[in-house]
């Protein structure tokens, strides 16, 4: 097992960022991810800033990280970036319990999720 010998490659006009162990369910996180897919990054940042969802601030940090990676590591123009992909995955589930009637035990599941955001530079059409 272990780490792959070849890390994941991204195209020359792409950059990505990933956040793991977000304390929300993947279903709730996917609602926020759908909100930003395909948008220009400045519009996506504005939408996340004014979103009422609690997890939107964590997604905003991930998007800002992807933008910084594009600018610093890949020398891409920030004004021409769009959110090319934003996909959500399931992470571990914390298991907790609660005593119930007649000596039983109720299971409480506390899910975690992860999100990966890929930004791509597109040329402005005249």
Swiss-Prot record:
Keywords: Ribonucleoprotein, Ribosomal protein, RNA-binding, rRNA-binding. It comes from the Bacteria. Gene3D superfamilies: Ribosomal protein L22/L17 (3.90.470.10). GO terms for molecular function: rRNA binding; structural constituent of ribosome. GO terms for cellular component: cytosolic large ribosomal subunit. Pfam families: Ribosomal_L22. GO terms for biological process: translation. InterPro entries: Ribosomal_uL22, Ribosomal_uL22_bac/chlpt-type, Ribosomal_uL22_bac/org-type, Ribosomal_uL22_sf. This protein binds specifically to 23S rRNA; its binding is stimulated by other ribosomal proteins, e.g. L4, L17, and L20. It is important during the early stages of 50S assembly. It makes multiple contacts with different domains of the 23S rRNA in the assembled 50S subunit and ribosome. The globular domain of the protein is located near the polypeptide exit tunnel on the outside of the subunit, while an extended beta-hairpin is found that lines the wall of the exit tunnel in the center of the 70S ribosome. HAMAP family: Ribosomal_uL22_B. Part of the 50S ribosomal subunit. Belongs to the universal ribosomal protein uL22 family. PANTHER family: CHLOROPLAST 50S RIBOSOMAL PROTEIN L22-RELATED, LARGE RIBOSOMAL SUBUNIT PROTEIN UL22M. This is Large ribosomal subunit protein uL22. It comes from Ruegeria sp. (strain TM1040) (Silicibacter sp.).
């Amino acid at each position: 097992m272990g780490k792959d010998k070849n890390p994941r490659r991204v195209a020359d006009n792409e950059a990505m960022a990933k956040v793991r162990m977000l304390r929300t369910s993947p279903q709730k996180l996917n609602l926020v991810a759908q909100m930003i897919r395909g948008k220009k990054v400045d519009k996506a940042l504005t939408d996340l800033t004014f979103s009422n969802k609690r997890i939107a601030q964590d997604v905003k940090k991930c998007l800002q990280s992807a933008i910084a990676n594009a600018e610093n590591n890949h020398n891409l123009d920030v004004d021409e970036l769009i959110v090319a992909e934003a996909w959500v995955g399931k992470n571990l589930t914390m298991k907790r319990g609660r005593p119930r009637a007649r000596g039983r035990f109720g299971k409480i599941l506390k899910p975690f999720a992860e999100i990966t955001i890929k930004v791509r530079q597109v040329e402005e059409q005249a």
